[in-house]
Amino acid sequence: MKPTNYHLFDFLDFDPDLSRDESLWKAYKPTSVYEKDGDICINVPFQKQVLSNDMAPDTTSPREEYTLVIRQYTSGITRLFIGFGEESMTDQSEMLQFSDRVKKLPLQVTQTEGEWLITTQDGIQRALIHVKPPVLDRWSELLPDPQETLDLRLYPDGKREIRLAAYDHFSPPRYDALPLAFCKRNGVKERATLSFESKPDECFAGTGERFAKMDLSGQTFFLKNQDGQGVNNRRTYKNIPFYLSSRMYGTFYHTCAHSKLSLAGQSTRSVQFLSDQAMLDVFVIAGDTMEEILRGYRDLTGYPSMPPLWSFGIWMSRMTYFSADEVNEICDRMRAEHYPCDVIHLDTGWFKTDWLCEWKFNEERFPDPKGFIQGLKKKGYRVSLWQLPYVAENAEQIDEARKNDYIAPLTKKQDSEGSNFSALDYAGTIDFTYPKATEWYKRLLKNLLDMGVTCIKTDFGENIHMDALYKGMKPELLNNLYALLYQKAAYEITKDVTGDGIVWARSAWAGCQRYPLHWGGDSCSSWDGMAGSLKGGLHFGLSGFAFWSHDVPGFHTLPNFMNSIVDDDVYMRWTQFGVFSSHIRYHGTNKREPWHYPAIA
């Protein structure tokens, strides 16, 4: 669809021909405010709009009123919640893991004729609501008066003012942002939007592993995890619904719904968020330094655990080693030629059939898996194994998985969107919303960990079967959250068996920082691939993550994906880049061992 450059269509996702049964409801001036259990509850009426480029109230429809809740925490954190009669505020979420520093601070409200002042009990201002209409010097009736609005200012740390975008319009009917609104389709609430004011010189960072310039201002992102298929495009493996602002605040949108985030892109005056869920749960975090703000975010969603010491050594891999003899030959040569190496990774080739993940070694090429692993351990190597969270149609476990609903039953056939380099038909996605499926998956990994495997590569997880019946939630909500549930399961069983908490993961969402570590996906072995990886890693680190790596010297080659030769300079410079990342792993579609680059090794 061609852009219209109008907010209603390009950001709020209404069809330009307005052929669908959809409606937009804009927040108006609050009608009342009260205290409840230390929170401030604000009754906000919403007026249905006549849909067009020029918005106007649809006075034939009665207003609908819903409660906006303000909650204050220590660490300079203010929370806004509105469920539009569909959802209730909760701290019971996979994404949330409050630290001991997060304490609720009771709020109180003082009402005057023109404003409602919200403070903590120590008298520090935390929010202000203007309820008096703006002063006018009326001389013209050419245009209608502006509609009522929600004029709310937040002061999370008692100092910095973060305003909702109450008046982002050209003429009164021509809006470029709305402070608060929801949308209905076929009479059902299904989307919600919230906007903050943005300043002309404001800069932004974060939002996950964003392969973009360091200042994200002027850009709009669709927060939907998908196979990035490289690091030089708008797709990304790791969306995080959190951004940092140069005005020394950050915002965490507590949702796993597909969302849209515009950082002064749709309108240069507003940061806008649109969720494909009729709920908004927003934490605004302010501080004197970026470190304070990131700490506040981690106070809400969890801190990265420390990976084991051995993981900070050098990992060697390629796609892929195919036999115990090949691996032993490479490991022996690494030692003989004095190349440091601590972990050897086996990618897709350790199964009976390449890419056919059955969580079992090929009996011919790896006749004694446990002895093979223990032998490598004696040489100073730990073993990492590749796998993925899907069960193929011809996998050994398919009947068991289907019979017990360990994979979500499909409602119809769909093609894979990810980088499936095999001809396999992935028949289903392991349903981590179902505890029995999670335990089944853990048992599959435990068999490998009991042999001496020390790390599981939790590849993929960005895409799931969307036309499937998951036990715990709709696929539209599970899509982004899946990475967290998947990595949590692998991390927990690895720590239970080996004592070391670690995974090697590609996808991510809010909370995944608790289960390190992550790597940057399938970058090109080129200068622009290295630059894209670096940009992604920097934004990822500014999204609450501490441990991150990337394939040295890039994953694939060009023009031939598998077979082009990696430039010596790229290999050398990418190695240096890897040394100064938290973790370094050589990996890619062809040879990565240093003796294949004699001019520099």
Predicted segments, located by residue:
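Aromatic- and carboxylate-enriched substrate-binding clefts and catalytic-loop regions
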Residues: 3, 83-85, 145, 157, ...
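Non-catalytic, glycine-rich low-complexity segments
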Residues: 15-40
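Extracellular/luminal recognition modules and glycoprotein regions
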Residues: 30, 38-54
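Short secondary-structure junctions
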Residues: 32, 105-110, 408-410
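A conserved hydrophobic secondary-structure block that centers on an alpha-helix together
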Residues: 228-233, 317-367
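Conserved, well-structured core segments
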Residues: 314
